[in-house]
Amino acid sequence: MKNEMQEFLTYLKVERRYSPETIHAYDRDIQHFFDYLTEVPIHSWNEVSVVDVRIYLGVLHRENYNRSSISRFLSSLRSFYHFLVERGVVETNPFASVSYKKGKMRLPEFFYEDEIEKFIDSIDGNQSLDQRNKALVEVLYATGMRVSELTNLTL
């Protein structure tokens, strides 16, 4: 079972060209499901039924995952099983017919212009990294990029 997991992650990296963060998220989700299956115990991807999937949803709910996280788990596992079907490892995808409503969309939190200006002005510039930090905050504000995107920038 671990072999198929590794093949899928390699497929995401090489053929789908997913980012390392996305691949890591898929890995985490599939590993969580694998850990659950070993406790049940289920010893083959082919043994998983729609009933097992529904029970797993209950487990995720009891572990206090929120709706959007559970939807992400389902999406990851649906994609993984699609891969397994395409490769002939399993005959059917038990996740294909299972749906789960996402939670309400949250509006993103944001700063007003005057709040950002106060924050940038609070970086006094007396310490060696202040200039860099000020520039980073200004780049974040001006472009709207995520912190994860900013950390991946190279000069």
Model-identified regions with their sequence ranges:
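Conserved catalytic core of the tyrosine transesterase superfamily
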Residues: 1-155
